[in-house]
């Protein structure tokens, strides 16, 4: 019966693990809807502020804002990387880091230096291993982040761009498509695309009256746009994290259930074998008498 006891111990251990993964699945599921609503709530604001900036670019075309000017020469590229603080979310971080590293290698082949600002412990650990210089990091950020909780981390990167020390800035994170699909995405944050603004301007013919002037309003709005873009990217990544964790824990719970059935079958066979052996020994003893 020693083999049966070992199997029974394994079953008990797997059931204990299954309870944990089931609980984590339920916790993630309870958060998914809330963080998705928070994430989706910011998308209309992002669309409208892009339209306003597009018209402001047209109105102040005589003096192009520094955030819109393409550099003559690129020496240093910055990445704002948004990862998770915790694991157990499937391949979410792994896929993101693969995409990021391919992009970094492409920039390094061009002779560009790399610096980064990182959200989340997983990203910090990855870029430290890759020996990428980190300008700033933020860990344990909230599930429904507010702008003032995030802007401190991105200021060193933005200031580096303003001083001309960084010529390009990319924002890297997962974009939520649906509960089953999270897409790692790299988007150029600075310099902002003038072509994008022209396209938006051509589509909408209305205009504003600017007070005091279009340039000062554009400066303020571009700063708000950068802050909100980072906030929205963090919100998207959190929604991806919760969905990925829910699916990962559901898969783990299902696998645990299948393993329990398999172990239970082995246990029954081992117990049957032990009982058959005992009966055989009893019958053999009776025959001997």
Swiss-Prot record:
Family matches, as Pfam families: ATP-synt (PF00231)
Give the CDD domains listed for this entry.
F1-ATPase_gamma
As for membrane topology, the entry says: Peripheral membrane protein
Q: Is Cell inner membrane one of the keywords UniProt gives this record?
A: yes
Cite the NCBIfam families for this sequence: ATPsyn_F1gamma, PRK05621.1-1
Subunit architecture: F-type ATPases have 2 components, CF(1) - the catalytic core - and CF(0) - the membrane proton channel. CF(1) has five subunits: alpha(3), beta(3), gamma(1), delta(1), epsilon(1). CF(0) has three main subunits: a, b and c.
Functionally, this protein is described as follows: Produces ATP from ADP in the presence of a proton gradient across the membrane. The gamma chain is believed to be important in regulating ATPase activity and the flow of protons through the CF(0) complex.
Name of the molecule in the record: ATP synthase gamma chain
């Amino acid at each position: 019966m020693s083999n049966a006891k070992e199997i029974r111990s394994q079953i008990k251990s797997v059931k204990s693990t299954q309870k944990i993964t089931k609980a984590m699945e339920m916790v993630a599921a309870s958060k998914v809807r809330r963080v998705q609503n928070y994430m989706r709530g910011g998308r209309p604001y992002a669309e409208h502020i892009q339209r306003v900036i597009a018209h402001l670019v047209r109105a102040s075309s005589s003096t192009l804002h520094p955030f819109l000017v393409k550099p003559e020469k690129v020496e240093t590229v910055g990445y704002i990387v948004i990862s998770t603080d915790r694991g157990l979310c499937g391949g979410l971080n792994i896929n993101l880091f693969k995409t990021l590293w391919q992009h970094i290698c492409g920039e390094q082949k061009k002779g560009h230096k790399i610096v980064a600002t990182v959200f989340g412990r997983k990203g910090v650990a990855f870029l430290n291993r890759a020996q990428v210089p980190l300008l700033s990091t933020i860990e344990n950020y909230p599930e429904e982040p507010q702008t003032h909780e995030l802007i401190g981390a991105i200021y060193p990167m933005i200031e580096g761009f303003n001083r001309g020390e960084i010529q390009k800035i990319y924002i890297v994170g997962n974009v939520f498509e649906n509960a089953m699909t999270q897409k790692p995405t790299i988007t150029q944050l600075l310099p902002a695309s003038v072509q994008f603004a022209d396209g938006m301007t051509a589509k909408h013919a209305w205009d504003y009256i600017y007070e005091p002037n279009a340039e000062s309003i554009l400066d303020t709005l571009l700063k708000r746009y950068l802050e909100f873009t980072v906030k929205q990217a963090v919100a998207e990544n959190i929604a991806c994290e919760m969905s990925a964790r829910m699916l990962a824990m559901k898969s783990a719970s299902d696998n645990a259930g299948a393993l329990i059935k398999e172990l239970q079958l082995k246990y029954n066979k081992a117990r049957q074998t032990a009982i058959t052996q005992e009966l055989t020994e009893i019958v053999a003893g009776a025959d001997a008498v």
